Each structure stands twice: as C-alpha cells, then as structure tokens.
C-alpha cells in the first residue's frame, strides 16, 4: 500500500473549532426578542381591552383615557419596530445560509478517531490550515482457492483531512520519520514510514509511505 501525502496551507484564522459563533448569538438574540415582542403584544392587547372596559365607566375621565391611548400607541409602534427588526434579522440569516451553501468549503476533520465535517461560514468561519491530503492506492490479491485467484485489484481514493495533533508525524530535513495511523469506524491500519522521499512542487509536499500491512 502506498500513500501520497499532500500538505497545503490555506488562508484564514488559526482556529478550526469555535465554542460560540456569531450566528448562534444572533439566533439566541432573535429568539429572546421574539419572546419579548410576544409578551409586549399580549400586554398591549390586555391593556387595550381593560381600557375599553374602563371607558364605559362614568368615573373615568377622557383625559385619562387619552393618556392611556397615547401610551398604547407608543407600545404598538415599538412592537411594529421590533417586528421589522426581527424580519431584517431573519432575512440576513437566510442570505447568510445561502452564502454558506454556495461558498462552503468542506473537509474531514480527524481527531481522536472521530471524523467530522467542517464547513466554512460567512461570519466567524475558519478556513483550512495545514491541510493534509492523503491519496491511498491499494493493490492486493485475494486467493479464492489454491488453483484460482482473483486478479489484482487497485483501489484509489482521496481523503482530505486536518490533523490536529500527531506527535510522530514530523518532517526533518525533508524526510518523514515516524508513523501515521488512519482509523475509521473503529478499524485502523498503521502505515510505517522509512526512507521517505519528499518532492517540492508548488507549495506542495509529496511524501511516500511504505507499509507492511
């Protein structure tokens, strides 16, 4: 089995994982604003109904009712302004999702035998740093019986992953020393490297790994 590793550098911040994103903050803020708007609308309806009942009483003066009416009109304007602001935030969220859909950059994130998907975002997003592309080419023979055997099968596939911490994965004087462990779905194969060669080509480092598995 041969593996060709391609190491590339991307633009962007150094963080691949953020604990609190701007989109989550805006979504939470919009939810709180919608809740406040609903409470304000309910209070406005309750106050309006109460004022209409007081209007029928003889002891309630017109000036007091007019003052309450002005207050309710101000509250109604505030509720309408809140609705407009919420609508603009929802429109912005829709545009943000569409931008992320068409401008996304997906890759596999490998950490602690867990493969995750990362997608770039418009705000608080992370481009890929020190991306490692691994092209595996596997040639093997499966013997069916002692008289018959399968033809040599060649399998080629490419995985683009980001390695967070690999202690033994080092490049010293353009040589690869150590080992690389690839694990997916609790099944792994160890790739032991020795006398590896590196060729420089357009900011790309090609490393050939030889394995005895």
Swiss-Prot record:
Family annotation (Pfam families): NAD-GH (PF10712)
Note: Partially overlaps SSB1.
Record's protein name: Putative uncharacterized protein YDL228C
């Amino acid at each position: 089995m041969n593996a060709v590793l391609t190491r590339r550098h991307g633009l962007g911040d150094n963080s691949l994982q953020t604990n609190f994103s701007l989109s989550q903050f805006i979504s939470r803020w919009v939810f709180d604003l919608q809740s406040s708007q609903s409470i304000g609308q309910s209070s406005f309806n309750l106050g309006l109904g109460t004022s209409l009942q007081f209007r029928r009483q003889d002891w309630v003066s017109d000036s007091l009712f007019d003052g309450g009416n002005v207050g309710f009109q101000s509250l109604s304007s505030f509720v309408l302004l809140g609705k407009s602001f919420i609508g603009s935030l929802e429109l912005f969220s829709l545009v943000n999702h569409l931008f992320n859909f068409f401008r996304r950059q997906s890759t596999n994130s490998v950490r602690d035998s867990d493969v995750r998907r990362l997608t770039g975002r418009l705000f608080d997003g992370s481009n890929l740093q020190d991306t490692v592309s691994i092209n595996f080419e596997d040639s093997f023979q499966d013997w069916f019986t002692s008289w018959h055997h399968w033809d040599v099968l060649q399998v080629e596939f490419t995985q683009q992953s980001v390695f967070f911490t690999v202690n033994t994965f080092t490049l010293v004087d353009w040589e690869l020393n150590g080992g690389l462990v690839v694990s997916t779905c609790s099944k792994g194969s160890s790739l032991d490297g020795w006398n590896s060669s590196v060729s420089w080509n357009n900011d790309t480092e090609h490393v050939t790994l030889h394995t005895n598995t």
